[in-house]
Amino acid sequence: MATNAKPIYQRILLKLSGEALQGAEGFGIDASVLDRMAQEVKELVELGIQVGVVIGGGNLFRGTGLAKAGMNRVVGDHMGMLATVMNGLAMRDALHRAYVNARLMSAIPLNGVCDNYSWAEAISLLRNNRVVIFAAGTGNPFFTTDSAACLRGIEIEAEAVLKATKVDGIFSADPVKHPDATLYDQLSYQDVLEKELKVMDLAAFTLARDHNLPIRVFNMNKPGALRRVVMGDKEGTLITK
């Protein structure tokens, strides 16, 4: 039951984890999951919401894992950035097949594959109701795609970062290990730090906090959850000042 007739956001940054794209496969990209996500993004565009997207790469590659095995962390992170580009290409294709205009921008130059990231161009595209997918993280090693999501969210002046996860929001403890854990409806940045809740890495989180960028954590696997978030319904956990 919608509480608002109109969306509460005009421009958002949607953060999708790479794992979200793998579905039940455990690796790679599940085409049915990809198409469902494209349809959910299409709904937002049809509501008049301007959508930026940052996708992780964990379904294809994780730099930190190989760094522990001895690989140079910078090399591993560069490989991780390329994984996000592969996911971005898949998402752009899924959006195009759903008749949604989308542009893929990479923080590292990949001529002939996708556009280079340009802040001015991204803003112009968003204003023209194009979905803009930001790939390759921040373009720098040692920074997560959550950091990229907050950075791009601030740059494009998004009203919130919507972090799509596999759980219903932020809990007082791991809901898998502790079934009686409490789901938080709303938290302040300070609450998250004091309770040491795992929302995103500290660099990403403090960036959002310092720029008063609200973060909404919700379950992307719940049908219609994304729409409910943008319509202002009770869904997931909101973090603000």
Swiss-Prot record:
Metabolic or biological pathway, per its Swiss-Prot or TrEMBL entry: Pyrimidine metabolism; CTP biosynthesis via de novo pathway; UDP from UMP (UMPK route): step 1/1
Single GO term (MF): UMP kinase activity
Keyword line: Allosteric enzyme, ATP-binding, Cytoplasm, Kinase, Nucleotide-binding, Pyrimidine biosynthesis, Transferase
Stretches the record annotates as Involved in allosteric activation by GTP: 23-28
Signal peptide, first to last residue: none
Family affiliation: Belongs to the UMP kinase family.
Role summary: Catalyzes the reversible phosphorylation of UMP to UDP.
Protein name, as recorded: Uridylate kinase
Organism of provenance: Sodalis glossinidius (strain morsitans)
